[in-house]
């Protein structure tokens, strides 16, 4: 997979240049639960167990970005925030790629706690992934997040997650934001919103028209 992605970057370069139309493809982005559920034992990890797992897997990962998820995939939100606050400053130097935090939608109670965490650990992260971007408040939620992040560091980037047709309609405006280099296509929530039944082996074809629309906006 990594080899194929690198080949795609090379194909995307303009003739005679060492750059692409936009910035380089972000590569492999791996979702990583800060606190993991252990189904065999019907419990969640303790902090020492989560710390040991992070040391074993995330440090040796070849992913270009490790995404610490605080949204839908995270059932222990408070514990995960506490864990990242105490552990990430210590282990960040050992993670070879970028670090991203996937946060809850702007304006929600969980989001306010997510932003408080980011204010503590921003020197150790590269990207903030915003769930449900552009759905309810249009670009206001992204502008609000961008202003918050700029107040911390101008190097922090936003990766909006496109999970609804309303957000797809605003894709051109989303890509025009200075803090946005890439977006993430949230296929599961998007397909549910469109009442499209996707399958594990055919989702690319089933969502092909929407992926083409998003790819076009990404290239303009």
Please place each PLM-identified region on the residue numbering.
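Expand to "…catalyze enediolate/carbanion chemistry for C-C bond making/breaking, isomerization
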Residues: 1-220
